[in-house]
């Protein structure tokens, strides 16, 4: 389905938007996109043009999860300015009630690839925060969600995990889940 959706974007970013919640994107929905999945308000498979950037922009009351699939990103902004993201890095930014401003920049001469997910926080008005994770081979790394008493990730009922699965291996998930594969079948 991803390859049949319109490729859009802005500034130096091109993306295929799979989820666009009308709660955030009033009047901007694109044909074929889902209008949200639970607290998931946005899901995009994006690439930055060589030396492309998003320009400085703001977020408020949204949790932004960025997963680097290919290439690198240089992060500028009010949270962890100067951070570099490489393949398998996962950046989790909570805008909360105070919000944050940021710009993502491709420092390289070639395109890169990133998955971005926006989640609506379960509790409004939380303070802004920033976390970094690294996806591991053969192991699930929780990058978002979990009970309120834990502090390893932003607490939420929706859990987001990332992993690498070697060719020929399988992953079993009890209960219902949604998976997004960046390569393979």
At which residue positions do the language-model features occur?
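Ligand-binding loop in jelly-roll beta-barrel domains
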Residues: 95-125
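Short beta-strand segments
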Residues: 43-44, 68, 94, 118
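Histidine-centered metal-chelating micro-motifs
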Residues: 54-55, 72-74, 91-92, 96-105
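A short glycine-rich, His/Asp/Glu-containing loop-to-beta-strand
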Residues: 13-63, 114, 131-172
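Hydrophobic transmembrane alpha-helices and immediately adjacent juxtamembrane helices
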Residues: 1-7
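Glycine- and acidic-residue-biased ligand/ion/polar-headgroup-sensing regions
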Residues: 60-79, 87-90, 167-169, 173-185
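C-terminal, non-catalytic macromolecule-binding modules
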Residues: 124-127, 138
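"Short basic amphipathic alpha-helical interaction patches in structured regions
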Residues: 79-86, 105-108, 130-134
